[in-house]
């Protein structure tokens, strides 16, 4: 479907602004609207005149710098930008090859003017290619500098965590303050590089191509389209004419892309004195960096009944204006953002490291300490003595601090000062001095006093991370995962754990839950509270206590200094000297030995092994809940149940985060940790038989299964032989699966069950006597087998003889019951439907049945889908009307018929939903037949 457009001139702009009554709801246009359309048609000649597109640059203003860098977003934009620049370069190269071929075939004497024009065009393309290549090199340089600051920030964060976990002293507090300032400088540099990168993103030229809506667009309708990209806005109004053409007051606008903002589009229908929002969508700008023009068709409504057509052209080289990025005073001048882009060089290392390396060179001869040993070089020792070294070093450090700036007013001054700073400092990877002397001092002297606290004690360990070990392309920044630094030994409650056989840390489940929460609906307060709880839990995680082997002072210092060795990657060997001092070690020399530790640096702990197990189990439950919440076509009822369970899991995590570690490791019963557990006497007695002192809050599923069979053996085996194993497994599946809300893939023997899961099941089922509950569960399991395997006559007697509303019911019961409505004689099917309708009078039974059958609508088995539709029809499950309607377009006739009958049985609401789906299906078929519309869905 082609859309005819007319764009008004400046004199006609007020015509569209006159708002009449919407024809979509009040018929076609009135006399006033017809007069308006005629006046627009008379001025259509002027409307076709090309007008200079207005740019949105005037909306950019200088603002405050947001110290919140987003490395993953920058990486995403950088990859898209590089891909687009390469495509643009390939197209220009292809054009250059074509022009070179024509230039070679053309004789210089023939058509001299044509030859000169071709030669001029050839030189123009060559110049443009050089600009693009230089542009790509500057983008690479910017991102390389950004990665350096990224790694420096991680290193500073890890060192800050190391000092915060060490013994508190005056020196450590001073080091923390200095590290905080260094970390702040890294954050500022990252944000400034992000702002500079925005100057290399080019511009987007957006052209309005009109609305596509078929039945939704009527003559006389007026719409307002608002596009927003950061602080840039484009608001334009349009009108649907009687000849199906569209008139808009503006044709195109230029947007400047940003790193952190996406393109937001909102369409509003103007109705006289009021307006109605048709829909709003968000488009990722990373998809727009393409060399060729794109025809973008965006679904404004959820069902795609109204679409917005845009033509988008990306210009990678924008030289008409200069942008102003938000920056603090003294970093960038107002007009120097684009002017200083191509003279920018990576910033020097923060002054904290400059002063530290200078102090290594200017230290006097090694002095003896109280014990007669040499004074080891350390960060803490340097920070504690930095105020006592005299004005000379203080003035030199002040000069370095002044030189350590990201940019200055003059770009050339910036380059000079930065290069001078680099050559003076040198960024030595190891301390300059005699290696033999250092080894002799380390071998003969006693343990140094100036090292990081905890090295003199064998029960504590320090692990300093090398930046090269971190994966910069990961999904998240591993501020904690890659740097376990100093944690006291944790008492182990199990023999296997005492031997060093520990499980994985809880960092992985925590991050998985946080990733799912960040992609979830932000309007859900339950999920936001859960996110805050998990974030607080992550902050409390500590590196697992390790037993390090004895390490030498020189080995540790070399490992610390090697963390910043990547800064010397591009320096020549003669540039590594400093003030005429001795040279640094050669590159081909072997690296210093890393301190030997026995634990993987990625293992984080909550302080006790049992707490780690509990947190892992409940975080996995949260992960399963969030994954189910993110599934499409989810009913409101199921969503409410999932959110309610998420609230309970948040409460469990809150209780776990407040537990006393010593009390947990020494407790002999659950009551000592959770006094409220005494209210469940029957369940508590069973649980205590499954646990041991020091591990009373969790037990393996196999242990709980054995205890259940041992406790209720006399009750089940005599009356229901062969059912004990099945009954106990069904009970455990309900405990692990949150009462049927989550369907477990099968009970694994190595699976862990927590007291909180067991207590939640007892509370959900209102169980006061566990023995009676198990007897009732045994009857239900027996009923399942009889309904599935018995003949029609026996199954019919069972249906009439049981009080079905008193069942739990189990998922297996509901499935067997639903299938009875399809298979077997008509009399049995009618009886199954009648009994299901009567059992629905019980509120608890109906809720569980609705929950199960609504989930069964998404089953891969078509027969289960058909049975679920029939069951929901008997239950009057109008809450699941939208999910049932979606099956009306199934490929199988039986499923379509069952879904149609169930939908129409819901009365007026079901009829409207069915008509809406049928109309949508017809529109989609008509839309697929149109071959001249290109659609890009975001």
UniProtKB/Swiss-Prot annotation:
Keyword presence, Translocase: no
Residue list for modification Phosphothreonine: 345
Modified residues (Phosphoserine): 9, 24, 340, 351, 384
Record key words, sorted: Phosphoprotein
Region Disordered: start-end pairs: 402-430, 579-603
Top-level division of the source organism's lineage: Eukaryota
KW Phosphoprotein (keyword) present: yes
Family: Belongs to the RIPOR family.
Protein name in the entry: RIPOR family member 3
Species name: Mus musculus (Mouse)
Name of the gene encoding the protein in the UniProt record: Ripor3
